[in-house]
Amino acid sequence: MDGVLVILLSLVLLVLVALILAVAWLARTARGDRHYGAATRATRSSSGMAASVDALALDDDDGPAVRVLPPVRPAAEGERPAGDAPGAAYGESAAAPDAGLGSPAPRAPHHDAAAAPEPGAAIGGAPTPAAGSPADASDTGRIAETVDTGTVLAVAAVADTPSRVAATEDTSLEAPLRESALRESAPGESASVRRAAEREAAQIVARAEREAAERLARVEREAAEIRRRGEDEVASLRNQARAEAAADASRAEAAVRDAARVELEAARAEIATARTSFEEELRVRRAELRGREEALAAREQRVEERTAGLDEHASRLAGREQDLLDREDELAHRTAEAADDEAARQAALERIAELTAVQARAELVSTIEHEARREAALLVREIEARAEEEGEERARRIVTTAIQRVASDQTTESVVTVLHLPGDEMKGRIIGREGRNIRTFESVTGVNVLIDDTPEAVLLSCFDPVRREIGRITLAALVSDGRIHPHRIEEEYARAQVEVEERCVRAGEDALLETGISEMHPELVTLLGRLRYRTSYGQNVLAHLIESAHLAGIMAAELRMALPLAKRAALLHDLGKALTHEVEGSHALIGADVARRYGESEEVVHAIEAHHNEVAPRSLCAVLTQAADQISGGRPGARRDSLESYVKRLERIEQIAGDRPGVDRVFAMQAGREVRVMVVPEEVDDVAAHLLARDVARQIEDELTYPGQIRVTVVRETRAVGTAR
């Protein structure tokens, strides 16, 4: 690869030299008339310069042009440079040193002589080493060095040309003659230079080809040597591998032989074991076969004996069958005779009784049916009486147990809330300038503020407990902060609304947690919590619902009913009271619609809508809900009424019952929940007592308004008195 690069570099340099020579020749031929003098050999000798370059300085409008000849390589010791005389440079004649200035140097012969150099000579007369000599490897480097040196000398000559031309012009007296001589010799010299360059290029190319061929031959020899060595090594490795493979094969064969011997011994042992086990199994099988053969023989003996017995039994059965056939014929004959006798007797009875058999059968059925109905009626009456007694007793026990197990605190609430103040001066701040603050508070909250002489207290009055609670929280926040003005009132009112809403949600969640009910719609939970601020006859509705849920759960457990369903229905039965001021209608029906809208079951919805008999109850859950509602709301102290209305209601109840004829005395008992009417037994019989109780109850329902139920009891007592003397 290095040889190829050197060859390519040499070719490039040769092309550059040829181009330089061609440009110089073209410039010389194109200049025309103006040429300036050249330095002669005598001038160079007198100036002391070493003549290694023959330069011709030409000058015209385009500038100077220089023809560069290769420099003369210094001769080695004992070697003469090529030329006509010793010490002559390449392309120079052997003129004497004292030649005149005007005599031009004949150059053509020297170029002709240089056109055919000896095979071993270098360019410019220097000897060239023969191919294969020790200097062969550095020939290309010397060629490049020679070309580079010539180029440098040419450039130096060009740089030195103006000074030499000036000196020549000053010293030369025959410039016109030299100019004409140079003009005549220029074409010949150009052709000589071209031929010399072509010969040199041909020699360099030939030498490069020889070097390439020699290097290629050398590379081929080295490759052959390497191939031979590789084949030897491969053969050696192959032999070694064969030897190792043979050794491994022998070892493997020995190992296989040992393994085969071990396996053979193991197989022999296994075969011996298998043979032993097979012989043992064969003995066992033979013993089993002998046992089976004996069993089969015994079984065949039994079968034969049984077959003989069956044959004997079959013969006996055949005899009995014949006997039965005979008896059957006899019975058929007797049956026919009996039927004839029965027909004769029936005809005689019909004639005597004057009734047919069908009529007698119908009369008998009618008699039996009448007796059965009488007995059934007596039995049903007895069962009903017992059921009423047991049912009433059990219901009383269940209700009593439920009431005893539920002990809930109840505090009545009014429509007025008292807010304590830190001082009486706060009342003036609440009123504000010209009553601005109190008017703003009442218009924003809808709660009336009552300020009287009560020390350190104001009253908040509103029939809506929710609005009253929002107003209380708003006023308490204003009093604690101290800043009371309309804008502040609106801010605190908005904050109080959010707080009350959160309290409602929390109250609903607490109610669910207390009653053990889960998975309820969030809207139902919110509505349930809003009942915390609702009252019914002074009783808190949410507390009433929680108490009703506990009562319904206890009664459902006593009756072995679904406990969660009863609790859920009782907890939601007054849900409509949270919306009664927003939606028209009964709170029972409103609550049922809301529960149905939010995914409650139909049993719960029916219990809600039927707890005040707007819809007839159709399930035990609805009845339990009614009972729990009545127990929670009807117990003494649960609900309150004003004393005046309470007294008037009791008086009117006694008056309604006392105005009836035959009534002796009337007692309103259990805070008006029960009325006992004592009648005169001579004037009012049992039927009239029932009518009196119904009429009194209907008149009370029509004229009075009361919570819960009122029971009317008419007592008719007959006394018989006897005196023993």
UniProtKB/Swiss-Prot annotation:
Residues 62-140, 165-195, 300-321 are annotated as: Disordered. PROSITE patterns: HD, KH_TYPE_1. The chain crosses the membrane at residues 4-24. GO terms for molecular function: RNA binding; RNA endonuclease activity. It is a single-pass membrane protein. It is found in: Cell membrane. The keyword NADP does not apply. Residues 84-100, 114-137 have a biased composition (Low complexity). Its EC number is 3.1.-.-. Belongs to the RNase Y family. This is Ribonuclease Y. It comes from Frankia alni (strain DSM 45986 / CECT 9034 / ACN14a). The lineage of its organism: Bacteria, Bacillati, Actinomycetota, Actinomycetes, Frankiales. The gene is rny.
